[in-house]
């Protein structure tokens, strides 16, 4: 896994493919206690990785395209090449999608993971708040994305958690995305800055003023922003219903 290089690449929509952080820096160890690393065994038996984030003691939020036959979540991690005492590895017992998730357009690219057991909250493991359904982040706002994905288009994943600051863009900046819908998605990243989330970062959060507003979804594949995040505020009611019912 790698570091955040220029968080400019895009997230792959196929299977459990994820993106990387390009143009970023290594996070201060355990300063993002909500971060989760997903180890995914695909339907074909391959192993891949995505990001995610803890939103309650027993639920992690991620991207729907990060689904798989089996998923194990690691919480409290910074350096995945080490057996850190802060880490909690928990199996996923249920993968829950919204109705009408579209794999080809990445529309409704959001998934809830129910953990086999509740996470133990520590200084290295904690939940992150979600927005209200009426909350909207304005273009020009700077937000943080983090992950263990690639640090460059031809680079491997990062062993350590990396992060990058990204700008919320006007919807017209994503006009080249055929299926972009500003009601359910967020356009993120300045093309000239070459900073973004890339392969391996899929499913990770977009954090604005301490609140998770987006989920890394997909991009153009060339490592050039803007990229698309799922807009969490549009799904808060669904998220709350699922958690209450499980």
UniProtKB/Swiss-Prot annotation:
Entry keyword annotation includes Hydrolase: yes
Pfam family, one: Trypsin
Originating organism: Rattus norvegicus
Location of this chain's protein in the cell: Secreted; Cytoplasmic granule
Active site: residue positions: 65, 109, 202
A GO cellular component annotation in the UniProt record: extracellular space
Peptidase S1 domain: residues covered: 21-244
EC number: 3.4.21.-
Protein's name in the database: Mast cell protease 4
Positions annotated as propeptide: 19-20
InterPro entries: Peptidase_S1_PA, Peptidase_S1_PA_chymotrypsin, Peptidase_S1A, Trypsin_dom, TRYPSIN_HIS
Signal peptide: 1-18
Family classification: Belongs to the peptidase S1 family. Granzyme subfamily.
First-listed, main subcellular location of the protein, grouped into a coarse class: secreted
Expression sites by tissue: Mast cells.
GO terms for MF: heparin binding; peptide binding; serine-type endopeptidase activity
Keywords per UniProt: Disulfide bond, Hydrolase, Protease, Secreted, Serine protease, Signal, Zymogen
GO biological process, one term: proteolysis
S-S bonds: 50-66, 143-208, 174-187
């Amino acid at each position: 896994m790698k570091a955040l290089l220029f968080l400019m690449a895009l997230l792959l929509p196929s299977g459990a493919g994820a993106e990387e952080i390009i143009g970023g820096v290594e996070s201060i160890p355990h300063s993002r206690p909500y971060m989760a690393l997903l180890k995914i065994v695909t339907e074909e038996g391959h192993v891949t990785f995505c990001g995610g984030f803890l939103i309650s003691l027993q639920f992690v939020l991620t991207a729907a395209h990060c689904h798989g036959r089996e998923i194990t979540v690691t919480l409290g991690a910074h350096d995945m090449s080490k057996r850190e005492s802060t880490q909690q590895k928990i199996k996923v017992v249920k993968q829950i999608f919204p109705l009408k998730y579209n794999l080809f357009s990445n529309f409704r690219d959001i998934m809830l993971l129910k953990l086999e057991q509740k996470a133990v909250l520590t200084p290295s493991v904690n939940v992150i708040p979600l927005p209200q359904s009426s909350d909207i982040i304005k273009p020009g706002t700077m937000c943080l994305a983090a992950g263990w994905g690639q640090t460059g288009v031809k680079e491997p994943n990062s062993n350590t958690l990396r992060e990058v600051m990204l700008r919320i863009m006007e919807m017209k900046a994503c006009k080249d995305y055929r299926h972009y819908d500003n009601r359910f998605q967020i356009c993120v990243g300045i093309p000239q800055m070459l900073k973004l989330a890339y392969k391996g970062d899929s499913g990770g959060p977009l954090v604005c003023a301490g609140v998770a507003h987006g989920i890394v979804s997909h991009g153009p594949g060339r490592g050039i922003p803007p990229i698309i995040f799922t807009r969490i505020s549009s799904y808060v009611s669904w998220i709350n219903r699922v958690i209450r019912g499980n």
